[in-house]
Amino acid sequence: LRGELERVWDAGTSTDPDGWTSENPARGHCTVAVLLVQDEFGGRILRGLVGGLSHFWNRLPDGSDVDLTRDQFVVWHVTDVEERSREYVLGTAREDGLTTRDRYATIIRRLADLRDVERRPIR
């Protein structure tokens, strides 16, 4: 999943379009990533502060944590961890008003297109 996401993430799907780079493709994608992980594997969504910035990751039903976007941070020190609902995450928006729901829908479409292209026979 992470490899596929790196192929469909861009500045437009990041919560930080000005800070996003191809060298750090996970930047600003934690909200859409946690929704996709929850779609695939279930579990809970956790939120904490990393360097004063809000960050989300997943806790799977077996108790293990999955964070597809942790590497966007140089220093990893999490505080104020709490569980958040899927509805809460979907209701968030970036500064220009583009909602996580809209960014999530874009990523879902791109993943479907990517997977469809990869399944097509070579002619």
What is the predicted function of each stretch?
Residues 1-123:
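A structural boundary/capping signal
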